[in-house]
A protein has these predicted regions:
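N-terminal hydrophobic/helix-forming segments and targeting peptides
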Residues: 1-192, 196, 200
Length: 202
């Protein structure tokens, strides 16, 4: 039986709010797997691919076809920590640097927690005229988590080089206009669609 609209929205919300940038897809894979294991055989390989097979199709001699979707999202990875405790980052996926300043993000830590941060750029009133006329580069941006030194960022906030970060966006649904707001819709909407389609075959 296919999921109801309410059930689909709940799954989309869970998938959208999973913090799973490219290379760190564990959370979104877990959400999809937990939903699917109620009606299907679920397997995961060493490359973190998740295979969902309706139980009644496991030993069938009928043709097999694949419904494919990916579970990651664009994100960031911390590549250095400044003496003042701010974090330089690389992008995982494509971002327009000019849209990022003042965005809230969540940064993963060595304590296996996520802490909030704000993407900051050099204030306009500190820029030279030449700087004001140039587009921003990722190298011009830092994430501020509130740390006041390198040691503070590492020891107290638990930040490490190589930790991922994602946009801090909660899922919401405008029932009146039937519109969803969130992050990671590409391609997690497809993940929901595929698992619901497979569920309907049971």
């Amino acid at each position: 039986m296919r999921s109801t609209k309410t059930e689909s929205l709940e799954l989309i919300k869970a998938l959208s709010e999973a913090k799973a940038p490219s290379g760190f897809e564990d959370a979104s894979i877990a959400v999809a797997g937990e939903f699917a294991e109620t009606f299907a055989a679920v397997e995961e390989d060493h490359l973190r691919n998740l295979y969902v097979t309706p139980k009644k199709s496991q030993n069938s001699d009928k043709p097999v076809f694949m419904l494919d979707a990916h579970g990651d999202e664009v994100g960031m990875m911390i590549h250095s920590i400044t003496p003042k405790g701010t974090l330089h980052f690389l992008t995982l996926g494509r971002w327009d640097p000019n849209t990022l300043p003042a965005s809230k993000v969540m940064v993963h830590t060595k304590f296996n927690t996520w802490i909030p941060g704000i993407i900051a750029a050099k204030p306009v009133h500190f820029m030279t005229e030449e700087e004001k006329g140039k587009p921003l580069n990722i190298a011009d941006l830092v994430i501020d988590v509130g740390a006041v030194s390198y040691e503070d960022a590492v020891e107290n906030f638990g930040v490490r080089i190589g930790e991922p970060a994602v946009s801090a966006v909660d899922f919401s649904y405008d029932e009146q206009h039937d519109i969803m707001f969130g992050k990671g819709f590409d391609c997690r909407i497809r993940s929901e669609e595929h698992t619901s389609e497979l569920q309907s075959l049971v």
